[in-house]
Amino acid sequence: MYKTKISVYPSCLSTLVHNDVTLSEVYDKIKNDDVLRQRTVNYRKAIEAKLPAKQLKKLKAEQFPMLMPAARFKEGRDMEHLDSYTGLCQCDIDNIPPDMMAEAKRRVRMLKFVAMFHVSMSGNGLHIYYFYQIPNEGLTPQVYQ
């Protein structure tokens, strides 16, 4: 589980250049990277300042890394460049009321299948990563034929 590598792109705009990193490395960056922390603070301030959704989307796309938890790619981010599946999935829960966040985190911690979770960039949600078994592994290419 901790050796599984996922593709992480510098931003949502990047389609070719990426790093393959473990969940432990992702978690460490989220918790300890000063640049990422400052960008998150700035993003949350932009939300509080009620910047238009279009500007927030642009800021998010340009300033934050993009994780691809479900699959690894050799080059581009499309089926043509699919290298392998990770067996990992991300659940994104948005709009958690502030008075319920601690309870939501407590409950997620209790789930045995959860590999990692963190608070979302907005501060109002959770990104939850979990492993699943791939049914009929290897049949996916047939779907696209």
What does each of the following model-derived ranges do?
Residues S120-Y130:
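Short, conserved phosphate-binding/catalytic loop or strand-edge motifs used
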Residues T86-Q90, G125-H127:
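Short, solvent-exposed beta-strand edge segments and adjacent coil->beta transition regions
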Residues F113-H118:
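A short linear hydrophobic-aromatic micro-motif
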Residues M101-M110, Y132-Q145:
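Helical (often loop-to-helix) elements that flank the catalytic cores of nucleotide-handling enzymes
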Residues D92, Y129-Q133:
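Short hydrophobic/aromatic beta-strand micro-patches
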Residues M1-G87:
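DNA replication initiation on ssDNA origins
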Residues P97, G123, I134:
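Short loop/turn segments at secondary-structure transitions that flank enzyme active sites
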Residues D92-M100:
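Short, surface-exposed ligand-recognition loops at beta-strand->loop->(often short) alpha-helix junctions
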